[in-house]
Amino acid sequence: MSTSRRAVLGAALGGAVAATAGLPADGAQAASPGLNLPAAAAPAASTAAWRLKWSPSARTDGLGAFETVEDDRAHSHPAGHPHIFATGDDWRFTIHTVDRDTSTDRQRQEVTGLRTGADSYLKWTEGQTWRITYSMYIPSTLKATTTFTHIMQMKQPGAGSSPIVVQSLRRDGGGKQTIELRLATDDILVGSADLDPLHDRWTDVDFQIKVGNGSAGSVRWILKSGSTTVVDRSRSGADTFLADRVRPKWGIYRSLGDTSGSLQDTYLLLTNLRGYQLA
């Protein structure tokens, strides 16, 4: 972000390299489908490698895996509680058409951050490179919309902060449903894929981000369905930093302004969440 734009945002808010190193084995087993990510050449001994920093289990850690939990924070639908919970080896995010966020033109059921202990969590700061891998199950009831439906975000913590990167379900004027990754700060589309073939099945996600200001950042986004690579796109020279730090969010965050009639009661499942730092 430019110095002038950062100053404006700072006042308003109060205040990847596409690496080729392969994922390290962490020994974790899950009942839900495991990650099946693209093979990559082994790095030379002198190069940086991905270091496992976070490997929660839904079964044993539950919602304690995350820094914060935003379950109906406006208390709009007490009868629907809990909207976010662990079930077996998965984390489930349930959303109903009657749910409302604190801004009543939208809905939100999300978790944030990577908790590593009762009072500790990982902080993604400027100059660092991080990688998140997981599997997600998108049911056919979780449809793309003509306005925003985000199922992953990268944000600066704090009230009112704008998203930096979003993974979204978007419906175009012709009704086509896609899943996309976008650099929200500068509204740059990194990549997209058809959503219909990914409905009602597990999809593997591999997201990498170098946290950098102005043009110092980068991202890489990979989706796999079984053994098929659905999308593998990178963007360098990207602005991936606002201030303080970057924190990931998962769940369902969507606008009520959809004009396609696609909003209905639905859910999202996540499993096999892993966090790595390039070091």
Named regions from a protein language model:
Residues 2, 9-22, 35-279:
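Low-complexity, Ser/Thr/Pro/Gly-rich disordered linker/stalk regions
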Residues 1-9, 27-30:
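Twin-arginine (Tat) signal peptide motif
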